[in-house]
């Protein structure tokens, strides 16, 4: 019983307080791993775009700091997040790279049920999450695409203490991004991409606790077919890098995932559709589950 109640507190510490603005009990920081996949480091050419993320996450497993399922916990997590992102890549160049600006505000539904012998927590909400805005630089070379970004998550969504499934996190998070896509062959039919993000979390306004910082790596290997279809394997690694304050646990949360992705381009309406499935494994001090993602991108 004592271990089970401690596990519930651990779940909240890593999966809710440090939950993302696109909360689905998946992320260690604001950023949700698995948002990007194939050619995730490649930004588009100058123009206006709307990119609509749809994420479904479910989990029935809570792992210990050793990466093992904690016995006695009956966990049921489900989240759907819809996040329209407006992207403007300008014609302005800085250090040879195109300057870009983008922003998103997610809509989130989350249901959480945790049962242990002698204790139970159940909650579900739908609401608006935290605002994110950033500036980017992007380069398109003969065999490489490069990108840099600096942005910030603002606590515009509702949050509370004690913790709940409310969509807001209640803290600011600067986030820095760097990525590269390598086109292996001259025809650019094979690609390998890596996208890194680092989050510096600040004090949570309701609990006065500062979550630990987080590093996320998303990667993808893909083959282009008929110039309009990409098939590939994608994955991510997310690692909490510092303890929370005050008196944060020494057990830093982490998780990895892998799965397939397909991207389809529709040239006439200038629209792109991508679908990916990611299976999580090696989770420590957090929930471990499955992610389905449908992303629609439209150029104007």
Label each region the model flagged:
Residues 69, 204-300:
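Outer membrane beta-barrel transmembrane domains
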Residues 27, 40-47, 91-100, 140-146, ...:
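Short loop/turn motifs that connect adjacent beta-strands in outer-membrane beta-barrel proteins
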Residues 76-84, 122-131, 168-174, 209-215, ...:
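Residues that define the transmembrane beta-barrel architecture of outer-membrane proteins
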Residues 27-28, 57-81, 115-124:
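Surface-exposed strand-loop-strand hairpins of Gram-negative outer-membrane beta-barrel proteins
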Residues 147-151, 158-243:
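Detector for outer-membrane/organellar transmembrane beta-barrel domains
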Residues 48-50, 97-105, 133, 146-152, ...:
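Transmembrane beta-strands of outer-membrane beta-barrel proteins
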Residues 56-60, 88, 105-111, 139, ...:
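Transmembrane beta-strands of outer-membrane beta-barrel pores
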Residues 40, 52, 84-88, 133-139, ...:
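Residues on the lipid-exposed face of transmembrane beta-strands in outer-membrane beta-barrel proteins
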